[in-house]
Amino acid sequence: MAAVDLEKLRASGAGKAIGVLTSGGDAQGMNAAVRAVTRMGIYVGAKVFLIYEGYEGLVEGGENIKQANWLSVSNIIQLGGTIIGSARCKAFTTREGRRAAAYNLVQHGITNLCVIGGDGSLTGANIFRSEWGSLLEELVAEGKISETTARTYSHLNIAGLVGSIDNDFCGTDMTIGTDSALHRIMEVIDAITTTAQSHQRTFVLEVMGRHCGYLALVSALASGADWLFIPEAPPEDGWENFMCERLGETRSRGSRLNIIIIAEGAIDRNGKPISSSYVKDLVVQRLGFDTRVTVLGHVQRGGTPSAFDRILSSKMGMEAVMALLEATPDTPACVVTLSGNQSVRLPLMECVQMTKEVQKAMDDKRFDEATQLRGGSFENNWNIYKLLAHQKPPKEKSNFSLAILNVGAPAAGMNAAVRSAVRTGISHGHTVYVVHDGFEGLAKGQVQEVGWHDVAGWLGRGGSMLGTKRTLPKGQLESIVENIRIYGIHALLVVGGFEAYEGVLQLVEARGRYEELCIVMCVIPATISNNVPGTDFSLGSDTAVNAAMESCDRIKQSASGTKRRVFIVETMGGYCGYLATVTGIAVGADAAYVFEDPFNIHDLKVNVEHMTEKMKTDIQRGLVLRNEKCHDYYTTEFLYNLYSSEGKGVFDCRTNVLGHLQQGGAPTPFDRNYGTKLGVKAMLWLSEKLREVYRKGRVFANAPDSACVIGLKKKAVAFSPVTELKKDTDFEHRMPREQWWLSLRLMLKMLAQYRISMAAYVSGELEHVTRRTLSMDKGF
């Protein structure tokens, strides 16, 4: 990956013009992308034009193409849809339409186009690019432009961003809008659950996605739905009987509701559509259950974008500008995609080709291949859904007993992880215990065996159902060892924050004294602070960022109404500045003070002066985030006094300490799924390790790799031994020594109009799409 030279970049932006348009169906997060492209373009010295109403505006020209300034895209990051409008355009599909579009671009000197839309919009852009030379020749022949003009603007560069709630584009893990659409679906499912339980009802929910089952699949996984229909994996013949059996069985076990999720493109093995009304009639006729159909429709496109979509779009928008600046006549039109947590550029047509192949595989009834072509994460979701949805009695009972506990502060997604771990353990024939109140509960013997149905309905619950404590094992090792012996525990799964990691480390270090601790252990990092070594993302931090972001959106609205007001907002996170930084990007904050990025009085002075300058423009509001432990002396109160004094007569100041509301209510779809997957993967790893260390009728594990932290690192799931992570940990400040998200701070400062050296900006490389990159199990 190449670091970019600032001066070269400034020069490369000068004299260039970038046009940005949104096309096709709208998606939440498009505004964040428009904002990022506009501001990054202006930042590097280019002119940026907003093209209104998609390709229609491009063809019609005139008032539809306007030059943007920094303020044009202010206060739009929190809005759903697209402020520059989108339209499906017939004219652009004709040669005349594209010729008119080329003329309009040349009139404004635009030779760089950033297109935000679905695969149709991006394919259209590529056709436009390939015809560009001949379109200009025709314009010269018609006498509309001179030959000199044609030579000056002889080449068109294209960078695409995929904006589609369906997540149906090959080559990217997530498209802009998908996460927000999942938020809408989960909000509806959570609301429906309460009414269904009151009446003992069955609900058939139809979700969008055209020919792609991603939304249906992920919402089924995140809600623990009883049955699922997706186009990529049609049910076996005779599914009607299986489904009714399953629903009857769930009801007889005391469940008061059944949820059936159906993708709008659902089909059976013969390609015949399966409709929600057909499924409803089937349940009513066969089982006599009170059944209702809810078609979610365009609700899924609406509402405010989630934090994930705002950050994804901002990151992709900036990367798209870099791709346009670095493009040459020989580089292919590219699309900026996401792989793990990395931005990657892929050739647009390779992705479109692969996306078409999925549809072709489905048309030819090659369903297994279609699932594979959707990518590793789709396939993985499908396998995990099948594993957890329905209990299959284990082939044989194992001799192993495992215990699961929560340690640290409550975090959203803990219950999802416990649920999936319990069910995976049971399906492997293990005896599964849960421990209440963390290590303290283990010392006191608060241990109980659980069955498959004991964890039903846990997925959408926030906090910790098992109860959690911060106490470390150190002071009560004797009692803990005693209970491990009494219950015959062979493995521990600890779901929690920094204390969970530190606690397991203490148990491992005590193995020399207590043979009972020579068991297999795994930590699932779950904390809103995202400060556990061995993973890029902790469970619960996505929910926390969304909770903090919603609060900041409201605070910003208050500031907009009051005029000339600056809010200083304090976030949690201990010494770790992840929450403050990521929330800052999601709400378009002016600054975010964190411990990892040391600041002094000079920096504060620059910030205050920047704020005073900003108040002279039309944007008369400010938002500053401060992590709770970012500085010993520059406290929230100090910042309030400083800003109040320096801003006297220009702006006034207020503070807000967000506090425990950041632990969030119901977990976000990301945390429900991430928790579910971590629970499954951790349990599979524990099972495998137990078989490895089982000798002569007993478990004896004392190798470093028998006690690990599971986490997502860059693009894959990794298991890191706690003893090896010790050297990478700053125990005094309770966080990893190196943190990947610090690179995001550059984005925060640039989008807030701070002039900074871009030497640290790392732009994505151009990679290629192959079947291997898609079906390779990237972990998630």
Curated annotation (Swiss-Prot):
InterPro entries: 6-Pfructokinase_euk, ATP_PFK, PFK_vert-type, Phosphofructokinase_CS, Phosphofructokinase_dom, PKF_sf. It catalyses: beta-D-fructose 6-phosphate + ATP = beta-D-fructose 1,6-bisphosphate + ADP + H(+). GlcNAcylation at Ser-529 by OGT decreases enzyme activity, leading to redirect glucose flux through the oxidative pentose phosphate pathway. Glycosylation is stimulated by both hypoxia and glucose deprivation. Residues 401-780 are annotated as: C-terminal regulatory PFK domain 2. GO terms for cellular component: 6-phosphofructokinase complex; cytosol; extracellular exosome; extracellular region; ficolin-1-rich granule lumen; membrane; secretory granule lumen. The modification Phosphotyrosine is found at Y640. Allosterically activated by ADP, AMP, or fructose 2,6-bisphosphate, and allosterically inhibited by ATP or citrate. GlcNAcylation by OGT overcomes allosteric regulation. The modification N-acetylalanine is found at A2. Beta-D-fructose 2,6-bisphosphate binds at residues 470, 527-531, 565, 572-574, 628, 654, 660-663, 734. Pathway: Carbohydrate degradation; glycolysis; D-glyceraldehyde 3-phosphate and glycerone phosphate from D-glucose: step 3/4. Residues 2-390 are annotated as: N-terminal catalytic PFK domain 1. Substrate binds at S164, I165, D166, R201, M208, G209, R210, E264, R292, H298, V299, Q300, R301. Mg(2+) binds at D119. It is found in: Cytoplasm. One of its GO terms (biological process) is negative regulation of insulin secretion. Changing S529A: Prevents GlcNAcylation and enhance enzyme activity. Its main location: cytoplasm. The modification Phosphoserine is found at S377, S775. Homo- and heterotetramers. Phosphofructokinase (PFK) enzyme functions as a tetramer composed of different combinations of 3 types of subunits, called PFKM (where M stands for Muscle), PFKL (Liver) and PFKP (Platelet). The composition of the PFK tetramer differs according to the tissue type it is present in. In muscles, it is composed of 4 PFKM subunits (also called M4). In the liver, the predominant form is a tetramer of PFKL subunits (L4). In erythrocytes, both PFKM and PFKL subunits randomly tetramerize to form M4, L4 and other combinations (ML3, M2L2, M3L). In human PFK exists as a system of 3 types of subunits, PFKM (muscle), PFKL (liver) and PFKP (platelet) isoenzymes. Glycosylation may play a role in cancer cell proliferation: inhibition of 6-phosphofructokinase activity and subsequent redirection of the glucose flux through the oxidative pentose phosphate pathway confers a selective growth advantage on cancer cells. Moreover GlcNAcylation is observed in multiple cancer cell lines and tissue samples and GlcNAcylation leads to larger xenografts tunors in mice. Belongs to the phosphofructokinase type A (PFKA) family. ATP-dependent PFK group I subfamily. Eukaryotic two domain clade 'E' sub-subfamily. Catalyzes the phosphorylation of D-fructose 6-phosphate to fructose 1,6-bisphosphate by ATP, the first committing step of glycolysis. Negatively regulates the phagocyte oxidative burst in response to bacterial infection by controlling cellular NADPH biosynthesis and NADPH oxidase-derived reactive oxygen species. Upon macrophage activation, drives the metabolic switch toward glycolysis, thus preventing glucose turnover that produces NADPH via pentose phosphate pathway. This is ATP-dependent 6-phosphofructokinase, liver type.
